[in-house]
A protein has these predicted regions:
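Conserved glycine-rich SAM-binding loop
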Residues: 46
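Conserved beta-strand signature within the Rossmann-like core of class I S-adenosyl-L-methionine
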Residues: 136-143
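Class I SAM-dependent methyltransferase SAM/SAH-binding core
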Residues: 49, 53-83, 88-93
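Acceptor-substrate binding/catalytic loop of class I
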Residues: 155-171
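A C-terminal cap/extension of S-adenosyl-L-methionine-dependent methyltransferases
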Residues: 184-227
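A short acidic, Gly/Pro-enriched loop at the edge of an enzyme's catalytic core
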Residues: 93-104
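Conserved alpha-helix/loop element of class I SAM-dependent methyltransferases that forms part
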Residues: 16-36
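A short, conserved alpha-helix within the catalytic core of class I
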Residues: 113-128
Length: 227
């Protein structure tokens, strides 16, 4: 695991750390180049975890959210003396750039933007991301997948689905990759979701379960879409 992910897990990933850290490590090892001296945009940043990840590895980062990133994002930048992060208010449905970034980053964003099964709006977001990337640039992202039917049940009863959060399917993610020249992905997680009994134990079991169950049953999708 990359040193920055291992050292700064709590700053980069704020929930389900074991499984989401594995997804982030996949992006870190499979991206086409290092962050150093790259231009990076994070959308839907909230606490700016992915911006922090890129910045501590030498990128020049624009950390953005619809109403601006949270106070925590700014506090982390100050605490770790990161001068290479700027904070902005940006709407992922209308980004004011063209061919400017080496990487665009996001995590757990798509379902909150559409709040329903609105694939057209998801396509628009990915089209905007494609537009702002330089040729050869990459979108690195981690999202919640719809997963197994028990995941859907638990989310409707206890999680964000009761607020109409949308969880894309594996097929949806293939459709969303269409504007890009190439894509690769990996899926993670089966038992580890939810903040209830034996979470750490369940998350560690996922490493083995993932090898024997279909990827459509997993609940985390990590994608690398290249322009």
């Amino acid at each position: 695991m990359h040193h920055s992910i291992n050292i700064y897990q709590k700053e980069i990933i704020t929930w389900d750390i074991f499984n989401w850290a594995r997804a982030l490590n996949y992006l870190d090892t499979e991206k086409s180049k290092q962050f150093k001296n790259s231009r990076v945009l994070e959308i839907g940043a909230d606490n700016g975890g992915l911006s922090f990840w890129a910045a501590v590895n030498g990128a020049f980062v624009e950390c953005s959210d619809l109403n601006g990133p949270s106070a925590i994002a700014r506090e982390n930048a100050q605490r770790f003396k990161l001068k290479n992060i700027e904070f902005q208010e940006l709407n992922g449905l209308g980004l004011p750039y063209t061919n400017e970034f080496d990487f665009v980053l996001f995590k757990s964003v798509l379902g909150g933007i559409v709040r329903s099964n609105d694939l057209l709006k998801l396509k628009r977001i990915m089209s905007e991301i494609h537009k702002v990337l330089k040729p050869g640039g990459e979108c690195l992202f981690i999202e919640n997948m719809d997963g197994f039917f028990l995941h859907s049940y638990m989310r409707r009863r206890y999680g964000a689905a009761k607020n109409f959060w949308y969880y894309p399917s594996l097929k949806d993610f293939f459709i969303l990759s269409k504007p890009f020249k190439s894509m690769k992905y990996q899926t993670f997680g089966f038992l580890g979701g939810g903040d209830f009994l034996l979470k750490n134990f369940r998350s560690k079991l996922d490493y083995y379960f993932e090898k024997i169950i279909p990827p459509t049953w997993h609940y985390i999708y990590a994608g690398i879409y290249k322009k």
